[in-house]
Regions:
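Short, charged/polar, Gly/Pro-enriched secondary-structure boundary elements
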Residues: 164-170
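Conserved acetyl-CoA-binding loop of GNAT-fold acetyltransferases
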Residues: 142-151
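Acetyl-CoA-dependent GNAT
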Residues: 5-89, 94, 99, 112, ...
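Conserved acyl-CoA
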Residues: 110-126
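Conserved beta-strand-loop-alpha-helix junction that forms the acyl-donor binding cleft
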Residues: 128-138, 155-156
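A short, internal acetyl-CoA/4′-phosphopantetheine-binding micro-motif in the GNAT/acyltransferase core
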Residues: 95-104, 131-132
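Short loop/turn motifs at secondary-structure junctions
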Residues: 92, 123-125, 145
């Protein structure tokens, strides 16, 4: 079907190399344009960020996926989601990009919808992401249906696409003061009441 956006996984060595090349370009162009930004150095260092992501990609359960958005015979963007089926079915969108030449005319929204449908077919019940505090990204994800959802353990703002269906939940006692889930809850509360978030 012409103009239909599909998702294809980068599986071959060549596809994975292209994926990481595009991800590095995205980080330099869109996320960390300041070449002196310490975060940029971390995300472009294959011994740090890539090695960490590769470990998540290679595990048997709750893994991440290197994906391309594909339309009319060419890749038009990419995504890096992780689906936690052993937990509560969360799809965490680590990275999402529509290549600049293909932005506009609702392409980003269509890619986001395709990604969320793809994730649902693989067991995702809801989605979450970090939008980095960028107002443009905040507006985009709100149009997709996400709502602001506190902050992560590093104080970065999160967004949540609530589940369409009821999600079973469990209760457990979190006793470790360094537990990331406690930090996330505390940061979400502090952010809501206008206080500085806790950082590691």
């Amino acid at each position: 079907m012409k103009n239909q956006i599909t998702i294809r996984e980068a599986i071959t060595e060549a596809d994975i190399a292209v994926f990481w090349g595009q991800l590095h370009t995205y980080h330099m162009r869109d996320i960390f344009p300041d070449s002196e930004d310490e975060n940029r150095k971390h995300f472009l260092d294959d011994t740090e960020y890539r090695a960490q992501i590769q470990r998540v990609h290679d595990r048997q359960q709750d893994r991440c996926y290197y994906l391309f958005f594909h339309r009319n015979g060419q890749d038009i963007g990419f995504a890096l989601p992780a689906i936690f089926t052993s937990e509560d079915g969360k799809c965490f969108i680590l990275e999402f990009c529509v290549f600049p030449a293909f932005r506009g005319s609702g392409t980003g929204r269509t890619c986001a919808d395709a990604l969320l449908s793809w994730a649902k077919m693989r067991g995702a019940r809801y989605a979450e992401l970090n939008y980095g505090g960028d107002e443009r990204r905040l507006r985009f994800w709100k149009r997709v249906g996400f709502v602001e959802n506190g902050a992560d353990e590093w104080g970065e703002p999160l967004m949540l696409l609530p589940p369409a269906d009821p999600v079973p939940f469990t209760v457990e006692v979190l006793e470790d003061p360094d537990d990331w889930q406690l930090r996330k809850l505390e940061n979400g509360f502090k952010r809501e009441i206008g206080e500085d978030v806790l950082t590691s």
